[in-house]
Amino acid sequence: MGAIVCINGCNANVLIPLHYKHMVIPPLTFSAKNLDTTKPGILDVRDVLDDPMAKENLATVIPIERASCRLLFVVSEDDRNWNSAYYAEQACNRLKEHGRTNYEVVSYPKAGHFLEVPYMPHHPSGIHPAVGKEVAFGGEPIVHADAQVDAWRRVQEFFRKHLQGLSGPLKSSL
């Protein structure tokens, strides 16, 4: 058994086609009409991606139900990069629909997109490489810092629990 941690991820492929063995997962499209601007001119891109669960976008959804390993979804509820909580919920729904129970979710209200190792600086906004402009990443500094400490502890515990005793590389099941 293996383990994967997904921190503020999307349940669909984004930006460019994803090639894996015989599969090609197309990228999820976006709607610039959902772009918002915050004070002082920072872009809010949270709702720019189209809904991966809409019928026309289902081909973009990653077939997570094929993963045989344990999954931990770490979610920031104030993620302004994209709607991490919604994407984790949809990934878990897909797992449930396929009879899978190999996942856990931990959620942090008021934490922003970049949940990194403890004591890394909080970045409420920054230049987004895909957008080329300053975008909001969300989060309140103190709550975000506390979330980083807790998430780091949980990730380490998760890996210790589910990777203990494994030796050698694991074969992908996708």
Predicted regions and their residues:
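Catalytic histidine-centered segment of alpha/beta-hydrolase-like enzymes
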Residues: 111-146
